[in-house]
Swiss-Prot record:
Function (record text): Probable transcription factor.
Tissue expression pattern: Expressed in roots, stems and leaf blades.
Database matches in SUPFAM superfamilies: Bet v1-like, Homeodomain-like
Molecular-function annotations in GO: DNA binding; DNA-binding transcription factor activity; lipid binding
Gene: HOX29
Protein name (record): Homeobox-leucine zipper protein HOX29
Gene3D superfamilies referenced in this protein's UniProt entry, alphabetically: 3.30.530.20, Homeodomain-like
Domain of life of the native organism: Eukaryota
UniProt main location, coarse: nucleus
One of the record's GO cellular component terms: nucleus
DNA-binding region (UniProt annotation): 2-65
Alphabetized PROSITE patterns for the sequence: HOMEOBOX_2 (PS50071), START (PS50848)
Length: 861
């Protein structure tokens, strides 16, 4: 048969070819020949033609998949376009309403102004007093702001109280439905697009926050590839997707009309920080189907205003109020559902300290933590249902979500320390704000064993927690640094303690330092559909020499990192981890610990702060060659940082420790000290990171930003120059003298072309300061510099020279060393022409402060 001619295949031949195609879409020549031998029907078909058939078949399959993808994208774009048109119509109605209100108030104001001159002064004052106290809020009698007008109208026009009968509850439900729909699709609330959120085919949806209404409110609209009934089922199960939800109990269920239900719910929400109590809600939820087939679920709080059954207050919860809220779910023409979500609450901000009050007055926070969380969860589940999702370590997506939920819930439970969970507070020593709570009822080993078969024997859990205020530091950047540089804040013996905490005799671990870790390896496990959350396993290489077969050399932590987006308003960033056994089973007990950072003011506030910076923060802690210029490898990070340079955030830290009963006091003391060390390390890192956002480009601008500085930042460069002049009889920097200002000396030392390093006077000297050139030579930052020892910088010959010259430095105060080679923090060699060292003395009593080294004419090899 001529291979160049068209071939018409019989059904038997097509069946044989299709069978092989599904087994192997791209068979080799030998495999095609084998097919011809096995199928006599293909004997008269040229082998080249069979090859062409498979090529065409692969092309058709590729075209089919591409066509299906384009059709799905077209349906999505069509539905999104329809949603945007509806949103545009709603905005036009809102604009028309605002224009009408403005004109009406303008006419009323003009009429009042014409009447004012006719009044004597005393009569005008009396009339003004009457207007201020009048209860009539019509436009002819008083002109008020929209917000005040709404409040007065709300206070005046009160519905009559309803009883707890089915008819009374139905009346409340219908009123709730009307108010919810007016917010979801009408103009009852003035909605503003949330900063950082733009609608589009790849966006999560249309996100808006309220402006000028009572309480805090958020609205989200989006497309989800699931049927309305399944969407409603998921959204009604709030603990499934809202990680701050501690519990939600259905107290009573009543039928309501055709396929409708009324439910009475009691819901508890965890507090996000130690500085505020948790919230609870007593709710009525109404589920019904509208005339157009849309499914609606609306909720509101039951109180004395609406009537209905009451729920006694529960200590220590603060009773919040949910204003008419809910979900409107419509089937989409192209499949799936169009969802409108409204969350409108009054979180009683009066009940929290002023420093965290903005958290409870932030609509952006409600949008991020509730409205957008619901959309993200739905999109994640829909993505997993329609595609074959492959995750690490053989885990199904649902199992990984359960692990994330378990980490967050365990962290929230420890953070809140509620009595009905078994927690009690240990009396503080009064030195700081570290709170220690104990849960003796949390016996972890009741039904659990490790893979070795040994039972878990800890008899209680202790939690050390504290909150601190951060200023001028990006929460995602800070947590990213903590994630990637665990050695900067973690103590190796506590990491070993974490990993061994639930093993037999774990509390016999010595409290002295076990040794350093050789490093950490981050093993990705999974991330959500929108890459705002990562789940990973941290492998810590343990260099400990502790003689215990139960302490593995490799320690494992399950870690969750979320809130990585820097441009989104109200984003909460978290780094939560828990020690895991090598078996990593789904039912293993977890003791989550970690960090949570919540911004507490507007990211659009760009007022210039007046900060006091220490030496490390003054000279910054960014990457080499970017510390003063402000250049950052993160691309848009600098712009976002500049836009929020005066931002504030609350950081909450909580660490859990399993313990045996008789060791509670010693474990509590260890945990308190460990928490203090972590707070100190985090403050040091935060100050260093904040300075890299505050110093603008240009040396002149940098010099202007260096004032005021702390005494250490102001005096150390002066001491370096004075000591150099004393020992060598020459000026280290020709352009400065004893009369120069501290800022000019600091700037000159920072920009000196030679690498200047200072190290401590200890048995194992560590670096405490380096100028720009020194940090470049060592390829490190000021934060990481403090973990580098002097001996690691030199090669073998350099270490020998150092040992020879070190006594001279201590006795004579100075020494000169020949040229040699040093090694950077990443192992790169750098040669220097010569090096000098001198003892730096303080300016008061002449005591030795540190040793300075200067490497002249250095260059990388």
């Amino acid at each position: 048969m001529d291979a160049s001619k068209y071939v018409r295949y019989t059904p038997e031949q097509v069946e044989a070819l299709e069978r092989l195609y599904y087994e192997c879409p791209k068979p080799s020549s030998l495999r095609r020949q084998q097919l011809v031998r096995e199928c006599p029907a293909l004997a008269n078909v040229d082998p080249k033609q069979i090859k062409v058939w498979f090529q065409n078949r692969r092309c058709r399959e590729k075209q089919r998949k591409e066509s299906s993808r384009l059709q799905a994208l077209n349906r999505k774009l069509t539905a999104m376009n329809k949603l945007l048109m509806e949103e545009n119509d709603r905005l036009q109605k809102q604009v028309s309403q605002l224009v009408y209100d403005h004109g009406r108030h303008g006419v009323a104001a003009a009429g009042m102004m014409r009447r004012v001159p006719a009044f004597p002064p005393q009569a005008a004052a009396a009339a003004g007093h009457q207007l201020a106290t009048a209860t009539d809020t019509s436009c002819e009698s008083v002109v008020t702001s929209g917000h005040h007008h709404q409040q007065q109208q709300h206070n005046v026009v009160q519905p009559p109280p309803r009883d707890a009968s089915p008819a009374g509850l139905m009346s409340i439900a219908e009123e709730t439905l009307t108010e919810f729909l007016s917010k979801a699709t009408g103009t009852a609330v003035e909605w503003l697009q949330m900063p950082g959120m733009k609608p589009g085919p790849d966006s999560i949806g249309i996100i808006a926050i309220s402006h000028g209404c009572a309480g805090v409110a958020a609205r989200a609209c989006g497309l989800v590839g699931m049927e309305p009934a399944k969407v409603a089922e998921i959204l009604k199960d709030r603990p499934l997707w809202l990680r701050d939800c501690r519990s939600m109990d259905v107290v009573n269920v009543l039928p309501a009309g055709a396929n409708g239900t009324i439910e009475l719910l009691y819901m508890q929400l965890y507090a996000p920080t130690t500085l505020a109590p948790a919230r609870d809600f007593w709710l009525l939820r109404y589920t019904s189907i509208l005339d157009d087939g849309s499914l609606v679920v609306c909720e509101r709080s039951l109180s004395s205003k609406q009537g209905g059954p009451s729920m006694p207050l529960v200590q220590p919860f603060i009773r919040g109020e949910m204003l008419p809220s809910g979900f409107l779910i419509r089937p989409s023409d192209g499949g799936g559902s169009v969802i409108h979500i409204v969350d409108h609450m009054d979180l009683e901000p009066w009940s929290v300290p002023e420093v965290v009050r903005p958290l409870y007055e932030s609509s952006a926070m409600v949008a991020q933590k509730i409205s957008m969380a619901a959309l993200r969860y739905l999109r994640q589940v829909a993505h997993e249902d329609t595609r074959s999702v492959i995750t690490g370590w053989g885990r199904q997506p649902a199992a990984l979500r359960a692990l994330s939920q378990k980490l967050t819930r365990g962290f929230n439970e420890a953070l809140n320390g509620l009595a009905d969970d078994g927690w009690s507070v240990i009396e503080s020593d009064g030195v700081d704000d570290v709170c220690i709570s104990v849960n003796s009822s949390k016996v972890i080993g009741c039904n659990a064993t490790f893979s070795s078969g040994l039972p878990i024997v800890s008899t209680g859990v202790l939690c050390a927690k504290a909150s601190m205020l951060l200023q001028d530091v990006s929460p995602p950047s800070l947590l990213q640094f903590l994630r990637e540089h665990r050695s900067q804040w973690a103590d190796s013996n506590l990491d070993a303690f974490f990993a061994s905490a639930m093993k037999p005799n774990f509390c016999n671990l010595p409290m002295s330092r076990l040794g350093g870790f050789s490093g950490q390896v981050i093993l990705p496990l999974a991330h959500t559909f929108e890459p705002e959350e990562f789940l990973e396993v941290i492998k810590l290489g343990n260099a400990s020499n502790y003689q215990d077969t139960l302490v593995h050399r490799d320690l494992f932590l399950l870690q969750m990192y979320n809130g990585v987006e820097e441009s989104s308003a109200g984003t909460c960033s978290e780094l939560i981890f828990a020690p895991i056994d090598a078996s990593f089973s789904d039912d293993s007990p977890l003791l989550p610990s970690g960090f949570r950072i919540i911004p507490i003011d507007s990211p659009l506030d760009t007022s210039s702060p007046n900060c006091t910076l220490d030496l490390a923060s003054t000279l910054e802690a960014a990457t080499p060659r970017s510390r003063i210029s402000g250049v950052n490898g993160g691309g848009g990070t600098c712009a976002a940082a500049a836009a929020s340079s005066s931002s504030k955030a609350v950081m909450t830290i909580a660490f859990q420790f399993a313990f045996d009963g008789h060791l509670q006091d010693s474990v509590a003391a260890m945990a308190r000290q460990y928490m203090r060390n972590i707070i100190s390390s985090v403050q040091r890192i935060a100050v260093a990171l904040s300075s890299s956002r505050l110093v603008p480009p240009g040396a002149a601008a940098a010099a202007a930003q260096l004032s005021p500085v702390t005494p250490e930042a102001a005096t150390l460069p002066r001491w370096i120059c004075q000591s150099y002049r004393f020992h060598f009889g020459a000026e280290l920097i020709k352009s400065v003298d004893a009369n120069s200002s501290n800022e000019s000396i600091l700037k000159a030392v920072w920009h000196h072309p030679s690498a200047i390093l200072c190290c401590s006077l200890k048995a194992m000297p560590v670096f405490t300061f380096a100028n720009q050139s020194g940090l470049d030579m060592l390829e490190t930052t000021l934060v990481a510099l403090q973990d580098m020892t002097l001996e690691k910088v030199f090669d073998d010959q350099g270490r020998k020279n150092l040992c020879t010259e070190l006594p001279n430095i201590m006795e004579q105060g100075m020494a000169c060393m020949e040229g040699g080679v040093c090694v950077s923090s990443v192992g790169r060699a750098a040669s220097y022409e010569k090096a000098v060292a001198w003892k730096v003395v303080d300016g008061d009593g002449g005591g030795a402060h540190c040793i300075s080294f200067m490497f002249i004419n250095w260059t990388f090899l």
